[in-house]
Regions:
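ATP-dependent carboxylate activation and anion-phosphoryl transfer catalytic cores
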Residues: 7-24, 28, 32, 48-50, ...
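Alpha-helix initiation/capping motif
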Residues: 59, 84, 112, 137, ...
Length: 447
């Protein structure tokens, strides 16, 4: 087992990893930006090094600075968390060339599944359903129009290296497609340094279902069942739950089996998420692989009782999975609400500032993952996530009642948050009946 791990991230996920390491008897090294200096969660690490100014390009995305901190801190491994360098295959390769274990998949597997076009091709090869679309990358607008005519409008333009909703555009006709190609290419090139695009048939009103997978270096690969992430706005998830409601058991098992088949074919190790969409007829289609821990991993932890961060660390240290597929059972229902410092009444405008008071909720089955505290300053430099409210109860109805109570109990003063919106969503009969799709929030709360 590792003696010391560097956490190449910040905020709630950094604190989550620090806590897991402490329980495993592992020392931690944190890295931080100048604007986060003095944050209370940094005091929980055994060492902390400043790696630069607030801009991510000059700090968390600077591979040389992260590696330098790792060498100064004398660590044996780096946990990337999510975002920043978490899905950067080059970073994973650099870590291992410096004899530092990257807590995640190999750089080869990451490069394979991180290329969405290559991942789709692999999925088709192993019999995992994919959305109809281009056979590969589209070279120009003429080829894109030809593909769209073949599969039919509407179509979805997607960046091969994309993620988080960036580099994606829906086109309803040929004129819109030409414009969407230019916009998606520019956005993807700016965000990922890669403007390559491909086309998919746009599946209208789908649900978003993803599968948590875990694989070790001994060839064992399993799934930890599914999460429903349908409640999202512009491809940004707001509420996640497990198990997915109103999902036929045969579809549930087929999706989970498909996810394992795909990661085995990719030679994937460690934790990852295989994402799918499910149409109104119950047909499911592979979207992409997230080669990292997900923001919403706690809902899976709650229903399975498996600590995913500890599992990641143990797998990276060379340990085999301590359980088989048949050992992984789910119990009850879990729901997570992402609490963002945003004003949902004004187009989800970020609300940076100082938190004057925060009182987290409590009670049976309630978990609040957050790094913030009274006096903490929410900076404008990064995403606005300030906490995750997770509940676990015997049934979905009880989980909904619990999370609604916990949201009303949560007090955050000094910045505007998405708490009022979460309450409205959870009060809506369409949510309680699980009769929603990925456009539900935008249609119901347009802004």
């Amino acid at each position: 087992m590792f003696k010391r791990i560097l956490i190449a991230n910040r905020g709630e996920i950094a604190l989550r990893i620090i806590r897991a390491c402490r329980e495993l008897g592992i020392e931690t090294v944190a890295v931080f930006i100048e604007a986060d200096r003095g944050s209370a969660y940094l005091e929980m690490a055994d060492a902390a090094y400043c790696i630069g100014p607030p801009k991510a390009a000059d700090s968390y995305l600077k591979i040389d600075r992260v590696i330098s901190a790792a060498e100064i801190g004398n660590v044996q491994a780096i946990h990337p968390g999510y975002g920043f360098l978490a899905e950067n295959a080059h970073f994973a390769e650099v870590c291992r060339s410096c004899n530092i274990e990257f807590i995640g998949p190999s750089h080869e597997a990451m490069a394979l599944v991180g290329d969405k076009n290559a991942a789709r091709r692999l999925a088709r090869e192993v019999g995992v359903p994919t959305v109809p679309g281009s056979d590969g990358l589209v070279k120009d607008s003429r080829e894109a129009v030809a593909v769209a005519r073949r599969i039919g409008f509407p179509v979805l333009v997607k960046a091969s290296a994309g993620g988080g909703g960036r580099g994606m555009r829906v086109a309803l006709d040929e004129e819109a497609l030409v414009a969407a190609l230019k916009q998606a290419e520019a956005e993807a090139d700016a965000a990922f340094g890669n403007g390559e695009l491909y086309l998919e048939k746009y599946v209208e009103h789908p649900r978003h279902v993803e599968v948590q997978v875990l694989a070790d270096h001994a060839g064992n690969a399993i799934h930890l069942w599914e999460r429903d992430c349908t409640m999202q706005r512009r491809h940004q998830k707001l509420i996640e739950e497990s198990p997915a409601p109103r999902l036929d058991d045969s579809v549930r098992r087929a999706i989970c089996d498909s996810a394992v088949r795909l990661i085995k074919a990719a030679g994937y190790t460690n934790a990852g998420t295989v994402e799918f969409i499910v149409d109104r007829q119950g047909h499911y289609y592979f979207i992409e692989v997230n080669a990292r821990i997900q923001v919403e991993h706690p809902v899976t932890e709650m229903v399975t009782g498996i600590d995913l961060i500890k599992a990641q660390i143990r797998v990276a240290a060379g340990e085999p999975l301590p359980f088989r597929q048949e050992d992984v059972r789910t119990r009850g229902a879990a729901i997570e609400c992402r609490i963002n410092a945003e004003d949902a009444t004004k187009g989800f405008r970020p609300s940076p500032g100082t938190i004057h008071r925060i009182i987290p909720p409590g009670g049976f089955g309630v978990r609040f993952d957050s790094h913030v505290h009274t006096g903490y300053t929410v900076t404008p430099y990064y995403d606005s996530l300030i906490g995750k409210l997770i509940v676990h109860q015997p049934t979905r109805d009880e989980a909904i009642a619990c999370v609604k109570r916990a949201l009303r109990e949560l007090r955050i003063e000094g910045v505007r948050t998405t708490v009022p919106l979460h309450v409205e969503i959870l009060d809506h009969p369409a949510f309680s009946e699980a009769r929603v799709d990925t456009t539900f929030i935008e249609r119901t709360w347009p802004s």
